[in-house]
Design a protein with these regions (language model features):
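Outer membrane beta-barrel transmembrane domains
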Residues: 54, 204-303
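Outer-membrane beta-barrel biogenesis signature
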Residues: 17-54, 123-135
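Outer-membrane pore/translocation modules
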Residues: 100-195, 199-206
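Transmembrane beta-barrel strands of outer-membrane/channel proteins
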Residues: 43-51, 87-91, 138-144, 191-195, ...
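Residue-level signature of outer-membrane beta-barrel architecture
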Residues: 36, 47, 77, 89, ...
C-alpha cells in the first residue's frame, strides 16, 4: 500500500499535498467505562481490541486492515473520601495486513496517571423507599512519552500509516475528565467525558486533540452474594487533525459514534467484565477508513 502514498519527506515544504487514507486513530486511547464497585483501592488487567479497514476509493486493490491489541495494567487508590488517583500502563501488540504483506509492532505504550476529586455526592430515599445516589467527579492527569515514537519524517518511504502505528506520541500530553453517576435502587447511569490535549514532540509532530465520552446504563442483579450487571450505552469520539511544523496533516482527524453492550460480574473482591462497541456513524479519511469493532475485557481485584 505504501507505493501509492505521497511521501512525507516533502512535508516541510508542502504539507497540504499529503494524501494518506490510513485512519487517524493513532496517539493512544484512554477508556474509563464502568469502574469496579470497590470501596478502596484496586488492581487489574484490561484487554482492548480495535479493528479498522481502509480501502482506497480510487483503487480498491489498495487496502489495509489494522488490528490494535493492548493489555493494560490499571489501578486506583482512594487518597481520601473525595480524592482518587488512577494509573494505566499499556502494552501494545498491533498487526497490519495490507496489499504489501503483514507487519507487526509490539511494545510498551504511554503511561498515564490521573486524579479525580468528588465535587458532589448526595443520597436520599425516593417515595418508593429506594436509595437515590448521585455523584459528580472531576479531574485531570498526564501521559508520559514512555511508548516509542520511532519514525523518520525525512525518510521518503514514511507514511501516515507508519505514524499512526507508533506505540506512543513522543510527547508529554494532558487530560481532563468528568464523571457523573446516578443510581436508583439497582438501576444506574454512568456518563463520562475525557479531553486529551497533545503537545508537539521532538520531531515537531503533534497528534490531534481527542474528545471521548460514554453514557452507559446498567442494571444490577443480585445472585446470592454476587452481582451481575448487564449494561448498554453509547460512545462518541472526535479527534482533531494532526499537525506537523504548524500545518495540518491532510486525511487526519475523525469522529465516530458507537453503540455499546456489555456485562459486569462482582464476586466479593473480584470484578470482571467485558463489552463490545459497534459503529453507528463514523468519518475517517473521508470515508475510506472504517471502524469495524471495538472490544474490552477486564479482571480486577480489590486490595
Amino acid at each position: 500500500m505504501k507505493k501509492i502514498f505521497f511521501i512525507l519527506g516533502f512535508l516541510v515544504l508542502s504539507i497540504s499535498s499529503i494524501a494518506c487514507p490510513i485512519c487517524g486513530c493513532g496517539g493512544g486511547n484512554l477508556y474509563f467505562g464502568l469502574l469496579p464497585n470497590f470501596s478502596s483501592q484496586f488492581l487489574g488487567i484490561r484487554y482492548h481490541y480495535a479493528e479498522y479497514h481502509t480501502q482506497l476509493a480510487n483503487d480498491p486493490t489498495q487496502f489495509s486492515t489494522n488490528h490494535y491489541n493492548s493489555v493494560e495494567v490499571w489501578t486506583g487508590f482512594n487518597i481520601s473520601r473525595r480524592l482518587k488517583v488512577f494509573g494505566f500502563v499499556p502494552y501494545y501488540a498491533n498487526k497490519q495486513v495490507d496489499d504489501d504483506g503483514t507487519s507487526f509492532k509490539n511494545g510498551l505504550g504511554d503511561i498515564t496517571a490521573m486524579a479525580q476529586y468528588q465535587l458532589l455526592h448526595t443520597t436520599k430515599r425516593t417515595n418508593s423507599n429506594k436509595v437515590l445516589d448521585q455523584q459528580v467527579w472531576f479531574g485531570g492527569g498526564f501521559k508520559l512519552p514512555t511508548g516509542g515514537f520511532n519514525v523518520n519524517l525525512k525518510d521518503t518511504n514514511t507514511t501516515i500509516a507508519d505514524i499512526n502505528a507508533q506505540l506512543g506520541t513522543g510527547s508529554l500530553d494532558f487530560l481532563l475528565n468528568g464523571l457523573y453517576t446516578i443510581s436508583v435502587g439497582n438501576f444506574g447511569v454512568n456518563a463520562s467525558a475525557t479531553y486529551k490535549i497533545n503537545t508537539t514532540n521532538h520531531d515537531q509532530y503533534r497528534y490531534g486533540n481527542k474528545f471521548s465520552s460514554t453514557c452507559i446504563g446498567y442494571y444490577k442483579i443480585a445472585v446470592k452474594q454476587h452481582t451481575i450487571s448487564p449494561n448498554i450505552g453509547i460512545g462518541y469520539e472526535s479527534v482533531s487533525s494532526n499537525v506537523l511544523n504548524g500545518a495540518k496533516v491532510q486525511y487526519t482527524g475523525s469522529h465516530v459514534t458507537t453503540a455499546l453492550a456489555g456485562v459486569e460480574f462482582g464476586f466479593n473482591k473480584i470484578g470482571m467484565g467485558m463489552n463490545v462497541q459497534l459503529p453507528m456513524q463514523q468519518n475517517f479519511a473521508e470515508g475510506q477508513t472504517q471502524l469495524r469493532l471495538k472490544a474490552m475485557a477486564h479482571l480486577t481485584f480489590a486490595l
